[in-house]
A protein has these predicted regions:
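His-Asp-centered metal-binding catalytic motifs of divalent-metal-dependent phosphohydrolases/nucleases
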Residues: 76, 103-124, 139, 160-169
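Divalent metal-dependent phosphate-bond-processing catalytic cores, especially two-metal-ion Mg2+/Mn2+ enzymes
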Residues: 1-35, 82-101, 111, 151, ...
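Basic/hydrophobic alpha-helical interface regions
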Residues: 27, 31, 36-45, 77
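Active-site flanking loop/helix segments enriched in acidic
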Residues: 50-79, 121-129
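Secondary-structure capping and boundary motifs in well-ordered enzyme cores
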Residues: 68-72, 97-106, 131-135, 180-187
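Short acidic, glycine/Ser/Thr-rich loop/turn "cap" segments at secondary-structure junctions
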Residues: 60-65, 91-95, 117-132, 143-146
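Short alpha-helical scaffolding segments that buttress acidic/His motifs in well-ordered protein cores
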Residues: 45-53, 105-109, 159-167, 188-192
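Histidine- and acidic-residue-rich, metal-dependent catalytic cores
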Residues: 73, 80, 134-173, 229-230
Length: 331
């Protein structure tokens, strides 16, 4: 049996580094779920997303974050389309989401991490990861502008609110949406974001080598209390991995099973009885436990595909020497 390729989705069928391949997969899914849908809006959204990450979108620089790259956004978007299809297959007709909601859901997924991407006139920040604490709010602002631009302005504020299901800036209970169906989509957004990245073939290597530097640049590895006392949360990429099992048990399971109401189970209907994402997530957790039991991080030898960020990032120490960290400020 061929090993799964690092640039492909959980089924090893869709190349995530190619936006056109993901678009074709999403459209195929939606043609099976709906009699018609706004395919032109999806095509434009995928094309614009490709240009945004590449730095070909007006006023924006290329996406330079190491972990939150185009592949992740495409992976998450495809996972969401599959959850939506599974939902439509599983519920009564009056509970179905319908094509209009589904298209807005996909557009929201494509741009859920747009808040990491810097403007051309941003001379205060030198890597998008510095926006980590506020990146979802910046994504919301981008979505509002984008949906107005593509004549879907009636959904602009809704999508801006809904994208917060993918982050921690607003608790899910405080996200305001018009009806329960939109909340179901929000729960799917948050779920797809988690299950896609945590089932990635190179998830563990990416956490150690790419996510940790992002957290450092986002000033997220140290917590400061009211008296100014600092507590180190993550000392290194390896320390991040040591604490990942507890994060999964205490945070991820709570979000998937409670806050997001088990919507991950809709993948079973889409895959006709299979749970590819949850199984992939479990494999990564089992692999991590083996690494931790052996206390041998050299076992993590998979090589994630390069992206713009990895090709241009000088290394964490060199970066910090060149650009001492500053508190984030929205630009």
């Amino acid at each position: 049996m061929r090993d799964r390729r690092s640039t492909y989705d959980i089924t090893d069928d869709v190349q995530l580094t190619d936006a056109d391949s993901v678009l074709k997969a999403v459209c195929t899914i939606f043609r099976s779920a709906f009699s018609e849908f706004n395919e032109n809006a999806l095509k434009q959204a995928f094309d614009d997303c490709e240009r945004l990450f590449a730095g070909d979108y007006s006023t924006y620089l290329p996406c330079d974050t190491l972990y939150h790259d185009k592949q992740h956004s495409m992976d998450m978007t495809l996972a969401l389309a599959r959850l939506i299809n599974g939902h439509e297959r599983s519920v009564a007709k009056d509970e179905r989401l319908g094509p209009d909601r589904a298209v807005i859901a996909i557009i929201t997924a494509l741009y859920h991490d747009s808040g990491y991407i810097r403007h051309e006139n941003d001379h205060r920040h030198f890597n998008g990861a510095e926006y980590t604490p506020i990146h979802v709010s910046r994504s919301a602002d981008f979505l509002k502008r984008y949906l107005h631009k593509v004549n879907l302005g009636e959904y602009a504020q809704l999508a801006a609110n809904m994208v917060h299901y993918t982050g921690y800036e607003i608790a899910p209970a405080h996200i305001r949406l018009p009806d329960e169906k939109w909340h179901v989509i929000g729960q799917m957004l948050g779920t797809a974001d988690l299950i896609a990245q945590m089932s990635d073939r190179c998830y563990l290597e990416k956490c150690r080598d790419r996510l940790f530097p992002e957290l450092v640049l986002g000033d997220m590895t140290v917590k400061v209390d009211e008296k100014g006392n600092e507590t180190v949360i993550y000392e290194s990429g390896e320390d991040l991995l040591r604490k990942t099992p507890a994060f999964y048990e205490n945070e991820v399971e709570n979000r998937l099973n409670k806050l997001f109401k088990n919507v991950y189970t809709y993948e079973i209907a889409h895959f006709e009885g299979e749970s590819h994402y949850i199984k992939g997530l479990g494999k990564n957790q089992a692999r991590l436990k083996n690494v931790l039991a052996a206390d041998d991080f050299s076992m993590l030898r998979r090589r994630p595909p390069e992206n713009y960020g990895t090709r241009h990032f000088p290394g964490l120490e060199a970066y910090l020497n060149q650009h001492p960290l500053k508190k984030t400020e929205q630009v």
